[in-house]
Design a protein with these regions (language model features):
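Glycine-/charge-enriched secondary-structure boundary and capping motifs
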Residues: 1-3, 7-14, 27-32, 91-101, ...
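Glycine-rich anion-binding loops of enzyme active sites
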Residues: 1-73, 218
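Acidic, glycine-rich loop-and-beta core segments that form the ion-binding/anion-interacting portion
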Residues: 55-100
Length: 224
């Protein structure tokens, strides 16, 4: 329906990707959701992205508050197959299952803008090279989007503890770790790729925004 409207009204761009996401379970085949989007403008020399990332850059993780609105098809299936109700109190979570699953998504707009404003200057490119929002696809797939050809991200899995909600889903549904990692954020909501010399400053900015942050890993040449 949305694509037909775009064609009928000669809007031009196609309606693709996340804007036409399927929601098996809560939505019937003849139902659809309407979403909004905002487009901003940035000067070319201020843009972030893979072309700025270099070997030696550091990955700084910003903690997630929960599932972050991703992976609910998997979670609903696991919960339904286990026969759990949303009102069930889960000791590992310290609250009901429903309360945990409805934890609001943490937003990173202010902390990311604070990083850029604190560490950048109009006269020189900033030391924040890229930002990766960990949404559908998990940590590996989303970080890969901000890496240029020839570079890889070396992630230290011991640098953080996966929050209990993800372990609960895995154990309840006997979900392989590979599937879990490819679907859920596992506690990492955003990754900043920055120059080594500003890591401490980035961590201070995150602390000032009351968002947990830590060094997640480093960017390396793929051949090393």
């Amino acid at each position: 329906v949305g694509s037909e409207m775009c064609m009928r009204d000669r809007i031009g761009p196609p309606l693709l990707g996340g804007e036409t996401a399927e929601h098996p379970g809560p939505m019937a085949p003849d139902e659809y959701d309407v979403v909004g989007a905002a487009t901003g403008v940035v000067e070319a020399d201020r843009m972030l992205g893979a072309e700025k990332v270099r070997a030696g850059d550091v990955l700084v993780a910003l903690g997630a508050s929960g599932l972050h609105s991703n992976g609910y098809s998997l979670v609903r299936r696991v919960v339904a197959d286990a026969g759990w109700g949303l009102e069930r109190t889960v000791p590992e979570l310290g609250r009901t299952l429903g309360e945990e699953l409805l934890e609001p998504t943490r937003l990173y707009t202010r902390v990311c803008l604070a990083m850029l404003e604190t560490l950048s200057s109009p006269a020189a490119p900033g030391p924040v090279h890229a930002l990766s929002h960990i949404t559908g696809g998990g940590l590996a797939a989303n970080v890969a989007r901000v890496l240029p050809a020839g570079l890889i991200a070396d992630v230290d899995r011991s640098s953080w503890t996966v929050p209990p909600v993800f372990s609960t889903v895995r154990e309840l549904g006997s979900v392989p770790w590979e599937d879990l990692e490819g679907t859920l954020n596992l506690g990492v909501g955003m990754v900043a790729v920055v120059e080594p010399g500003v890591v401490d400053a980035v961590l201070r900015v995150a602390e000032g925004s009351e968002i947990p942050a830590w060094v997640l890993g480093e960017v390396h040449d793929a051949g090393k």
